[in-house]
């Protein structure tokens, strides 16, 4: 397969992932690319995300969510963007780096089976959930329009969380809604990495331009994964929008509340799904394509140095 020009994606994957034991299983440029690409895609798709968030909280139509945001004023349209910008930048670093490290730990010399990719993706999702859940918590409070007066800034939210006791800071503050976050991130990462490479390899064999297989693979995987886990996304948004000591509903009570407010219909839980498809397609398509491009350039430079 190495000599076939129409299969560059697979050739690259063999060079990057089937490294010899004892060698580094990650590349600093790949980490940097994950950070930069996630930063850019988050900024570009944040308005879409905010509309989706309002739908998840208030179960309203797209037009009503847009009208509500516009009524609050353009100056608030990007309110709450700093936590996701920081968290997504860290996510890009953790997502690809941790996955590759775990994959090479599970199978140092390859080939990497579906089970290896699933396990490495699952564990990288756990790391991601532990590291980034506090950022998402602050972000969801900031984006809830009902709390703008009480919590106008990130600092005001952090001040509220730090006023709790140690256990309260974790369970009611920074890690509120952690269990559904853990399930969503671990399963989502496992699904994404399990099928990203097979789809990309299949498209690369069709003689398409280098960037197309990665873009399509990331878009398809991001869309399918997001739709499969969308009920968990809605549950997390609702749980993490609550703040304070009193009347803090449990995980089960929050799930029941989401189900009841959606009229006990699965279709209403998926309200906003069209925007989720668009946001996930753009975000994961760009992230995967840019990461693949940087990875390819990195290895091209290394080959020139060795020649």
Swiss-Prot record:
Domain of life of the source: Eukaryota
UniProt-annotated stretches for the region Disordered: 1-23
Residue ranges of the TM segments: 31-51, 82-102, 112-132, 181-201, 215-235, 269-290
Keyword Repeat tagged: yes
GO MF term set: NAD transmembrane transporter activity
Keywords of this entry: Membrane, Mitochondrion, Mitochondrion inner membrane, Repeat, Transmembrane, Transmembrane helix, Transport
InterPro entries for this protein: Mito_NAD+_Carrier (IPR052465), Mitochondrial_sb/sol_carrier (IPR018108), Mt_carrier_dom_sf (IPR023395)
Major site of localization recorded for this protein: mitochondrion
Disulfide bonds: none
Name recorded for this polypeptide: Solute carrier family 25 member 53
């Amino acid at each position: 397969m190495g000599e076939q020009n129409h299969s560059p994606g697979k050739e690259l994957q063999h060079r990057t992932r089937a490294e010899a034991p004892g060698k580094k299983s990650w590349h600093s440029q790949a980490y940097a690319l994950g950070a930069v690409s996630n930063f850019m895609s988050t900024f570009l798709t944040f308005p879409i995300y905010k509309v989706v968030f309002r739908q998840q909280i208030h179960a309203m139509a797209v037009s009503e969510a847009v009208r509500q945001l516009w009524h609050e004023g353009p100056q608030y349209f990007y309110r709450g963007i700093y936590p996701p910008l920081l968290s997504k930048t860290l996510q890009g670093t953790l997502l690809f780096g941790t996955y590759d490290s775990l994959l090479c730990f599970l199978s140092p010399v390859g080939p990497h089976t579906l089970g290896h990719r699933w396990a490495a993706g699952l564990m990288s999702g756990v790391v991601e959930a532990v590291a980034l859940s506090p950022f998402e918590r602050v972000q969801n409070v900031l984006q809830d329009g009902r709390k703008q007066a009480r919590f106008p800034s990130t600092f005001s939210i952090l001040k509220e969380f730090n006023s709790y006791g140690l256990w309260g800071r974790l369970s009611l503050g920074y890690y509120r809604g952690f269990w559904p976050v853990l399930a969503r991130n671990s399963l989502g990462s496992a699904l994404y990495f399990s099928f990203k490479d097979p789809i990309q390899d299949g498209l690369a064999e069709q003689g398409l331009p280098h960037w197309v297989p990665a873009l399509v693979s990331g878009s398809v995987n991001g869309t399918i994964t997001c739709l499969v886990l969308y009920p968990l996304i809605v549950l997390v948004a609702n749980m993490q929008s609550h703040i304070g000591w009193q009347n803090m509903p449990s995980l089960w009570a929050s799930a029941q509340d989401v189900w009841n407010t959606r009229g006990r219909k699965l279709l209403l839980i998926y309200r906003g799904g069209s925007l989720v498809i668009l946001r996930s397609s753009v975000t994961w398509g760009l992230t995967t394509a840019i990461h693949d491009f940087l990875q390819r350039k990195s290895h091209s430079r290394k080959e020139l140095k060795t020649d």
